[in-house]
Amino acid sequence: MADMSVKQLADLVRTTPERLLEQLKEAGVAITHVDQTISDEEKRKLLLHLKTSHSTETDKKRSKIVLKRKKLSVVKSGKKSVNVEIRSKRTYTKPVVEQKRETEPAPTQEVPLTSDTTNLNEKAEVNVATLEKAVEAEVKEEAKKTPSEKKETPKKGPRKETRRSRKPDKEDKWEREELHMTKLVEERRRRHKPAHMPDSDSASAKLEQGFARPTAPVVREVALPESITVADLAQKMSVKAAEVIKAMMKLGAMVTINQRIDQETAAIVVEEMGHKPKLIKEDVLEENLVATLGEQTGEAVPRAPVVTIMGHVDHGKTSLLDYIRRTKVTSTEAGGITQHIGAYHVETELGMITFLDTPGHEAFTAMRARGAKCTDIVVLVVAADDGVMPQTVEAIQHARAAKVPVVVAVNKIDKPEADPERIKTELSTHDVLPEEWGGDTMFQPISAKTGEGIDALLERILLQAEVLELKAVDNGPARGMVVESRLDRGRGPVATVLVTSGELHLGDILLVGREYGRVRAMIGDDGRPCESAGPSMPVEVLGLSGTSVAGEEAIVVPDERKAREIARFRQGKYREVRLAKKQTAHLERIFDRMGEGKQNTLNIVLKADVQGSLEALTEALNKLSTDEVKVNIIASGVGGITESDVNLAIASDAVVIGFNVRADAPTRVLVEREGVDLRYYSIIYDLIDEVKKALSGLLAPEFEEKIVGLAEVRDVFRSSKIGAIAGCMVVEGVVRRHLPIRVLRDNVVIYEGQLESLRRYKEDVAEVRQGTECGIGVKNYNDVKVGDQIEVYEKTQVHRTIA
């Protein structure tokens, strides 16, 4: 055959040149291009290679042939007939090559099963018993044959044989018991023998990849919220709660498994146990809200100053504001004293001013602090006839803490005993120096009764406001502060909001602390409804979900859903903090109460008209508690007294106190029927004094001892009927019968008892005065000696009061 190119040979054998080049390369022929010629020798070499490779593949595929045969027959035994299905299988194996025959002298030949099955078939026709043995033999033969076909691992071999040897017994049992149910047996055998069984070696290999014990301690990054229970902290560190409690005991803190701990304490515990703490801020939602609102953009315009009038009680703060507003607020206040924060927007001839009137009573410290917090200028009212008082000094401290300027108004200069110079001297001791003395505080003598000096005071206020250059953005979402809040029976929660920037409109979504809502109505300080309020404008807002806490910041939120989420988050956070405080206080009191006597407690259900008054009353009443008696306010709230309040008082044996609120008709009927102690007050002085009297009645009685007389023993008489009788001379006071006595020997008390008998000249007498002789019999005491002294005293109960 003539030489031809690789391409021509590929066309001849009907294959691609590339495939032919690959086969030449596998055959060891050094041809790399399709245009190269291929010789006859190289063709034979390629042909030999192809034959060898194809024969190996076909040998592998056809080295084993299995023929299966199935035969059905019926065996009759009397009236019964049994269907017998006999399956046979024959395997043909191709002989191995000559080289293997030389190395392996005796190849293994499988025993054909056809003859066995034929014999079984013949025997099955004879009787049923022989057929049963034949089926058993066939099953055993197949069971022996099955493991020999599988590849066995030396390590797992014995275990496999044990399992296989057990399996035919179960099948034999089925064959013996259910011989007449051949089809059912086959179906069950098929279910027990799935077509594809997972290899035990691979399964064991998977099982070997189990838990690996760490060689070094696992250090975890523990995410810590602002408060967390001990159980949750232990779960985050994957340790038992007892380990965490033990670690905290080493740090000096006694905790329980359900107790909440703060973030800092949890971080210390995590570091102590070898992990890394990661502090999480839970107020991300609020921060995102503030970032969304951002700084209010727009042109800042001048606004009216917010002026807070502060000073001691009865120094004329509200009277001064009355004269400025040309109204009579003082006459409507209970007792003539202010007990709420009043916000008023006043138009004067000189300009607009917003006044905040704060209480002067010592119980309203929080109100005064709130007034100083949201103000621009503080007007300190001092009575010229009274001088500087404790609440005056407190007002100065609030103004300094808020870093606001102070204008001093010396009131009541119309009185003859007024001394303004003394006021300046007293205030100078508190670093409040007038301008004429080189200080920076403006002083203005005024009279709220006659109106003297009030115009000059307003000029000074506006002058101070010009110096401060007060400006605010008058458009955009409003921001403000809740000055006061209350619960109105007809209108629901009402909050007095002082707008600090932006403009508040009807329908805005307002978020105030833990409460939110849509502004349904706005009422100005003059009692008229309004539709909008700008900077420095106080308005009453209706529509909040609950009574807000005075002093909270009010923000207009564009999305009601976002406002609801933030309010609920704050409520949950407040609840957690309150429970943590209560639990901490409870744990701290456990050891304090050990060894102490029972502490008398006065339970009170307190209801007030506004949030600020409720806060002040709660603080004032809690301050009345002492080591012996305690005020326990079991419930408090804003609004009228309801039946639930009375039922709570009945259950806890409490007194119901209403401050400027009343009970409705059904509640009064319940109070009369159950006999609950219900008290109304409108002046804080009266309320505190009444609670003091009630606490004084709970105090344990205190007794004073007063020595009535002293007798000296001159002689001792013995009597078989009465015992020892001391003949005495009364040297001091009066000796009375049935009073307690003390027997003194060498001025040391040796006995305390009762004076049983008192005689003079064998006559019983009630008392013996000084300088008179008498006979004294001491009850249950006979060891009286000459020279002893008998001291007679009496106990008197002292009325105790709460300081």
UniProtKB/Swiss-Prot annotation:
Region named G5: 447-449
Record-annotated membrane-spanning stretches: none
Protein name per the record: Translation initiation factor IF-2
Functional note: One of the essential components for the initiation of protein synthesis. Protects formylmethionyl-tRNA from spontaneous hydrolysis and promotes its binding to the 30S ribosomal subunits. Also involved in the hydrolysis of GTP during the formation of the 70S ribosomal complex.
UniProt-annotated stretches for the region G2: 336-340
Positions that bind GTP: 311-318, 357-361, 411-414
GO CC annotation: cytosol
InterPro entries reported in the protein's UniProt record: DNA-bd_dom_put_sf, EF-G-like_DII, IF2_II, IF2_N, P-loop_NTPase, Small_GTP-bd, T_Tr_GTP-bd_dom, TF_IF2_bacterial-like
Annotated segments matching region G1: 311-318
Protein's cellular compartments: Cytoplasm
